[in-house]
C-alpha cells in the first residue's frame, strides 16, 4: 500500500508540474 501511495503521489506531483508549466506558458 505504501508503495502504491508513493507512486500516486509522484504522479500527482508530475501533474501539478505540468499544470504549472501550462499556466507559466
Curated annotation (Swiss-Prot):
Q: Where is the composition biased (Polar residues)?
A: 16-25
The lineage's top-level taxon is Eukaryota
Q: Hey, what's the signal peptide range on this chain?
A: none
Compositional bias, Basic and acidic residues, is annotated for: 1-10
Q: Where is this region: Disordered?
A: 1-25
Name used for this protein in its record: Unknown protein 4
